Amino acid sequence: MSGFHIVRISSAILLAIGISSAALAQQSLERIVITYPSRSIASVDLYIAQDRGFFRQEGLLADVVQVRGNIGVTALLSGDVHAINNVGTIIRAMERTDLPAKVVSQSLKKNLFWLVTKPDVKSLRDLKGKVFGTTTLGGSQHLATVRLLQKAGLVPDKDITVVIGGDVPAQLQSLLAGAIHLAALSPPTVILARDKFKLKIHGSTLDDLPNLQNGLAVSEKLLRERRDFVKRVLRARSRAHRYFWENERGTAEVLANYLKVELPVALESYRLARPAFTANGLATDQEVEEFLRADAEVLKLKEPVHAAKIFDFSVQREVNQELGLK
């Protein structure tokens, strides 16, 4: 697990970047710093690429740093990190403003969240006046939950108070403590909520519209000036992605190790999450269009943003051709 650091504030990113300097000098590997927002199966491709040596095969020494989504976006734009995994957060920022960044790969085509409450909440309608905890305001977890609450007949802006609740495991603890009343949990945490704590699950975002939650986003400057570097990163992640699809047991072992859960929980997490992942690091044109149209409605935009403003899958397509990924 060398190279994985969990940090809470942006200043710690710089500390994490410096940790591997000695190893870098000894092994002649080029550093890549990638952020991710929450401990869950959604970032499994990063765990696999790290654990199974795919980053090193590309001559990369990966520091994978946990920070809140909006902090990751700020760090990307300032050049403190090379890439971010939580593309949903930066997509929402790009839909509303002009940011010099591009989403270059897409690993998830559906959100991986299950709405969870204590057992006394019989339906989502009972949450009126209650508190929902999320990782990032305006991020994938937040907006996916908003859509499900709307379907249940609530007006989230008026009926629900939204607070920052930490990452998914922290949200479970807040839910158990009564600090929040609703959490949107990903595997394996949702399995622990169901089996260990007997909490109530109200529905899944897997049944919702396409939602491009995780992938890889880089600055336009990095993509323009260091395209080969970006390609090496995508090649490592694509090998990890292929490993995910072809090796259930190995993927579950990686999850169990990184997320500190028992192997049966990791196996169920894999099987629950598998349908949400793309086959080749690409979202289809239809999935992108549906996603942007739904986002425009939730964000109250006049019209959907053009896909070309946000996505550039050209390097991922080159990698897919090289690796024979369909």
Residue map of PLM features:
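Bacterial N-terminal signal peptides
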Residues: 8-21
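N-terminal secretory signal peptides that target proteins for export/translocation
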Residues: 1-6
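Pocket-lining segment of extracytoplasmic ligand-binding domains
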Residues: 88-89, 168-259
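Short, glycine-/small- and polar/acidic-enriched structural segments
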Residues: 26-167, 174-177, 181-187, 199-204, ...
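Solvent-exposed, polar/charged alpha-helical surfaces in well-ordered, non-transmembrane soluble domains
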Residues: 52-53, 74, 78, 102, ...
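Conserved C-terminal helix/tail region of periplasmic/extracytoplasmic solute-binding proteins
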Residues: 292-326
